[in-house]
Amino acid sequence: MSKIAAAFKKQRKCFIPFITAGDPNLDVTEQLIVAMANAGADIVELGIPFSDPVAEGEVIQAANIRALSAGTTTDKIFAMLKNVRTKTDVPLVFLTYINPIFTYGTEKFLANCQSVGLDGIIVPDVPFEEKAPLAELCRKYGVDLIPLVAPTSDERIKMIAKDAEGYVYIVSSLGVTGVRSDITTDIAAMTEKIRQATDVPAAVGFGIATPEQAEEMAAVSDGAIVGSAVVKIVGKYGTDCVQPVSDYVKEMAEAVHKVQ
């Protein structure tokens, strides 16, 4: 059983925070991963900074710029993760675009994921129809290729879910990432369609910021993913962000974990 599958089995409802690697610097990223795991995060998503992150709103775009300005590279992220793995075995997932993977060398990238104990990757700009070569290499190196499912036709939702590994990332609303005041998509109906097609868990992301929203989303799926709200705290506190992020993650994880 993969570590991601084990996390959902153990917790039933998972809380999954996202941060951009290298924002404000990689030392702080390392501390954040460990602190978030200790605060109750079941899985941690890490963004690889990229100059053109098409699915991201302004909060995460700004984090990408800060991380790149701090000299963050993919090699330095892998080196940092080696250290992380001496401190925590929390499942780790990269959220990245195909360009940084392709530029790095797809096979080399996935071999390095395997060697640092990275558990999954999410690549928003690779459509389902074009994922076969990447999926094959992911399987070769034991890395789950986690699909994004947006509010779309029943057939498409089921087609993507049927092939899913790790978890299905349900995009709660169309558009870019960011905090929403309310989420209007019928998540329960989407989860139901996904469950008809696969046993792989489904977690909801895009726009969750409060414990109430996280609890609400966990009630109709298998977990809540929170990115922009965490990255906002990192942006506000800079190198002093570890404690405030940890406090926020603890509150959010408690809200998700109390859902039965």
What function would you assign to each model-found segment?
Residues M1-A7, D52-I60, T72-K82, F102-K108, ...:
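Active-site-adjacent beta->alpha loops and helix N-cap segments on the catalytic face
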Residues F15-I19, V44-L46, L92-T96, I121-V123, ...:
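Hydrophobic faces of well-ordered beta-strands that scaffold small-molecule active sites
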Residues T20-N25, L95-T103, P127-F128, L148-T152, ...:
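Glycine-rich beta-to-alpha transition loops that act as phosphate-gripper elements at the mouths
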Residues L26-M36, T152-K162, V204, I208-A224:
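Catalytic cores of alpha/beta
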Residues A41-D52, L118-I122, P127-E130, S172-G178, ...:
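Glycine-rich phosphate-binding active-site loops on the catalytic face of alpha/beta enzymes
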Residues I48, V59-V123, V256:
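Active-site beta->alpha loop and helix N-cap motifs at the rims of alpha/beta catalytic domains
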Residues I77, E192-V200, A209-Q260:
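Alpha/beta catalytic cores of nucleotide-metabolism and tRNA/nucleoside-modifying enzymes
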